[in-house]
């Protein structure tokens, strides 16, 4: 749980493949306050589902939005033939529109000056490739149902089965596969490459309320407030944590049943942690 925002976060890696310039990870992430439905269901994100779409609500400006492969949400506005970043904290990204050499169609090229990558999107806004500084690239192919194939810089192929806007299965060249099962918009089971199953239960608002691991152990139960922030976590060992939020004074309090102690987290208007106050009165500051 993020102590400042109260968001319950899951980071999971479903595939790890040898690649260059570094190993390729197929990861998924969950955020309890995320109300969007992705290719992996409500609250989940899959980085290579990144796409660009036009803002049709703003008739006065020409704007596009995208969530990058790094998880940043970015908005660009066209001004005098240039695409100008409208998002705070996202100056690492630069975007331009180019004409594809073969098709002659427009393509969007997003430069990440931190990771030194180029993410290339076609005229439909679909991610076509991620190009690395060593001239290697990761490429993507699509069918009627969505993403069909991922080709790594080493030429290895991952086959992706989609239906109804959801990823159902990813299979590599030696037959290893990860499967995803849903109930409506909710991802309930992930069947891993070793055939173990991680199971997720959800509350009435679509927040993950419990997680059962591949050994069949329900190791975590969550309770939430109306904003999707965790208010209590119960662990299989019997210990628990509670979370209290003071939005007015920007102070959150966490109680740990195992030690009987509390910690107070203070943060600024940008939700950046400024100070942790401990039970004994000592504190740690952040700048």
Predicted regions, residues:
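Intrinsically disordered, low-complexity segments enriched in small residues
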Residues: 1-40
């Amino acid at each position: 749980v993020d102590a400042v925002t109260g968001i319950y976060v899951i980071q999971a890696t479903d595939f790890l493949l040898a690649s260059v310039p570094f190993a390729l990870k197929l990861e998924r992430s969950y955020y309890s306050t995320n109300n969007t439905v992705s290719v992996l269901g409500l609250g989940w994100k899959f980085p290579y589902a990144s796409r660009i779409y036009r803002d049709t609500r703003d008739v006065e400006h020409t704007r596009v939005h995208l969530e990058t492969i790094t998880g940043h949400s970015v908005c660009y506005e066209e001004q005098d033939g240039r695409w100008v970043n409208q998002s705070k904290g996202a100056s690492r990204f630069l975007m331009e529109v180019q004409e594809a050499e073969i098709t002659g169609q427009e393509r969007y090229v997003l430069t990440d000056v931190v990771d030194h990558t180029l993410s290339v999107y076609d005229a439909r806004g679909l991610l076509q490739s991620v190009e690395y500084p060593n001239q290697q690239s990761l490429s993507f192919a699509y069918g009627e149902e969505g993403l069909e194939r991922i080709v790594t810089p080493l030429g290895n192929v991952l086959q992706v089965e989609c239906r109804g806007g959801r990823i159902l299965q990813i299979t590599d060249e030696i037959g290893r596969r990860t499967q995803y099962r849903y109930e409506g918009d909710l991802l309930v089971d992930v069947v891993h490459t070793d055939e173990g199953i991680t199971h997720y239960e959800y509350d009435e608002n679509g927040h993950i309320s419990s997680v059962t691991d591949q050994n069949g152990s329900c190791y975590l139960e969550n309770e939430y407030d109306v904003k999707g922030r965790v208010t209590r976590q119960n662990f299989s060992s019997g210990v628990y944590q509670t979370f209290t939020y003071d939005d007015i004074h920007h102070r959150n309090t966490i109680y740990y049943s195992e030690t009987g102690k509390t910690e107070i987290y203070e943060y600024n208007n940008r939700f950046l942690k400024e100070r942790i106050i401990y039970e004994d009165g000592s504190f740690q500051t952040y700048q």
